[in-house]
Amino acid sequence: MTITGIIAEFNPFHNGHKYLLDQAEGLKIVAMSGNFMQRGEPAIVDKWTRTQMALENGADLVVELPFLVSVQAADFFGQGAMDILDRLGIDSLVFGTEEVRDYQKIADLYTEKGAEMEKFVENLPDSLSYPQKTQAMWKEFAGLDFSGNTPNHVLALAYAKAVAGRNIKLHPIQRQGAGYHSVNKDVDFASATALRQHQKDQDFLERFMPSVALFEQASKVIWEDYFPLLRYQILSNPDLTTIYQVNQEMAVRIKEAIKTAQSVEELVELVTTKRYTKARVRRLLTYILMQARESDLPEAIHVLGFTEKGRQHLKSLKGQVSLVSRIGKEPWDAMTQKADQIYQLGKPSIAEQNFGRVPIRIETN
């Protein structure tokens, strides 16, 4: 049987995600971000709610990406997620993209010339942002030309890099309907961005979300809910360069900007430069909110939920892969668990995220 991997955030889960799961074959394993997202923001609803949505709509097994995998630039995000899915035995990866290309050929190219390609990136001027450097690399070696407004395509290239040298086939699926950043309501498939923006519009949600009741019952958060905490972390920390990935230049800019910024959005605007994209600045602010430090990734894989089919697969992995299904006295990943505790501070109504939580089971889907 085919074992298909999907790397996802489901922030929140919508019809486009359901379409992707419908297109996937065999046993479907999702490696999903926890409570903080790749572009440096809190999930609108918590990881358990999103796991339930995924299982109700076609996923067989959902595992969690650790905090230091999920809140990363595309390449590191893709690499970390692929490492986990590879260990779970996937033989193909399905993903949505704005531009369907021969990603397998791109992966083969990276297998062959990866070292040379990375050297090329290292030698590019530091005035360029990391995405600009990556795009220059793909243009040089693969003749790819694209605008930076296609985040799924950028992630797809990161996945192609991450599967290089592994026995995993890539299956791109044309992204349906609205673009990633689109807030348009008059489309066949709405984007997660639009759903977050129009979260109080009942009719809109019902049109585009398969598990709308789950979404409506859940506590919802936005970055602004954490702004007082973020301000406190910035003001009370004498040396921000002790935080993961924060350099001297960014530390100075953030300390200066917090004097006048009245919101997270304003802070991001003030700190962003040509070289430091908004997504990168948001990630740095997320690291500061967590007081994140460089740390090893957990050896074990945290299971968030499964169907009967998923449970059988987990059983077949026993002894080969270290799995955690209940977080008790032994932490799974201290950094992720700290992030979960801080996530809970966004709204008093958010349920406990770790202790006593067991994987969500769904009999059939």
UniProtKB/Swiss-Prot annotation:
Give an example GO molecular function. ligase activity, forming carbon-nitrogen bonds
Give start-end ranges for the coiled-coil region(s): none
Primary location class: cytoplasm
The entry marks the following residues as binding ATP, namely 7-20, 96, 152, 175
Location comes to: Cytoplasm
Kindly list the GO CC terms recorded for this protein.
Answer: cytoplasm
The record ties this protein, via InterPro entries, to: Rossmann-like_a/b/a_fold, tRNA(Met)_cyd_acetate_ligase
Q: Which UniProt keywords apply?
A: ATP-binding, Cytoplasm, Ligase, Nucleotide-binding, RNA-binding, tRNA processing, tRNA-binding
Single Gene Ontology BP annotation:
tRNA modification
The record's annotation in Gene3D superfamilies points to:
HUPs
Catalysed reactions, semicolon-separated: cytidine(34) in elongator tRNA(Met) + acetate + ATP = N(4)-acetylcytidine(34) in elongator tRNA(Met) + AMP + diphosphate
Give the EC number. Answer: 6.3.4.-
Q: Which domain of life is it from?
A: Bacteria
One Pfam family per UniProt: HIGH_NTase1
Q: Which HAMAP family match?
A: TmcAL
The similarity comment for this entry is: Belongs to the TmcAL family.
Q: What does this protein do?
A: Catalyzes the formation of N(4)-acetylcytidine (ac(4)C) at the wobble position of elongator tRNA(Met), using acetate and ATP as substrates. First activates an acetate ion to form acetyladenylate (Ac-AMP) and then transfers the acetyl group to tRNA to form ac(4)C34.
Q: What is this protein called?
A: tRNA(Met) cytidine acetate ligase
Its gene name is tmcAL
